[in-house]
């Protein structure tokens, strides 16, 4: 019997997958636990529409990420920090501070965890900070660290 999985079932199938399973297993386990439905023409068509809709949403997310990447290339974020001699900072500028400055100065909200800045910025001047905007789209934020 062909079934469409509505949830992941360990060792059997993932959500949205169409598989052949024994009739008894389908009737006594999958249907009773509501983890699968029978693969009727109507259900298959509905699954196809859901997949198409999900694909369109994914394409829109990628387009939005590319637009944000282009916007980030054209701007600069200015962060102030206390520094000593030679342009060395007392402490460092963190991803959280950069995210807050980006929100305040340009009204762009980016999660600090998406910034690839493991040790922070330790010197005055310009720094390019890599940002993971999407699984497929990476960008950079140009950060200008100035003395307070």
UniProtKB/Swiss-Prot annotation:
Molecular function in Gene Ontology: rRNA binding; structural constituent of ribosome
Entry GO terms, CC: ribonucleoprotein complex; ribosome
Organism encoding this protein: Staphylococcus carnosus (strain TM300)
Family: Belongs to the bacterial ribosomal protein bL9 family.
Protein name: Large ribosomal subunit protein bL9
InterPro entries in UniProt: Ribosomal_bL9 (IPR000244), Ribosomal_bL9/RNase_H1_N (IPR009027), Ribosomal_bL9_bac/chp (IPR020594), Ribosomal_bL9_C (IPR020069), Ribosomal_bL9_C_sf (IPR036791), Ribosomal_bL9_N (IPR020070), Ribosomal_bL9_N_sf (IPR036935)
Ranges for region Disordered: 46-65
Function: Binds to the 23S rRNA.
Keyword Membrane: no
């Amino acid at each position: 019997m062909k079934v469409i999985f509505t949830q992941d079932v360990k060792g059997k199938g993932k959500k949205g997958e169409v598989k052949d399973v024994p009739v008894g297993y389908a009737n006594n386990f999958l249907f009773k636990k509501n983890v699968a439905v029978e693969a009727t023409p109507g259900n298959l068509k509905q699954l196809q529409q859901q997949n198409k809709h999900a694909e369109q949403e994914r394409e829109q997310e990628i387009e939005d990420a590319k637009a944000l990447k282009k916007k980030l290339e054209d701007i600069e974020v200015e962060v102030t920090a206390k520094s000593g001699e030679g342009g060395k900072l007392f402490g460092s500028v963190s991803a959280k501070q950069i995210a807050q400055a980006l929100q305040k100065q340009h009204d762009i909200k980016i999660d600090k965890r998406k910034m690839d800045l493991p040790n922070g910025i330790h010197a005055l001047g310009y720094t390019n900070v890599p940002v993971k905007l999407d699984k497929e789209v990476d960008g950079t934020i140009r950060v200008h660290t100035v003395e307070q």
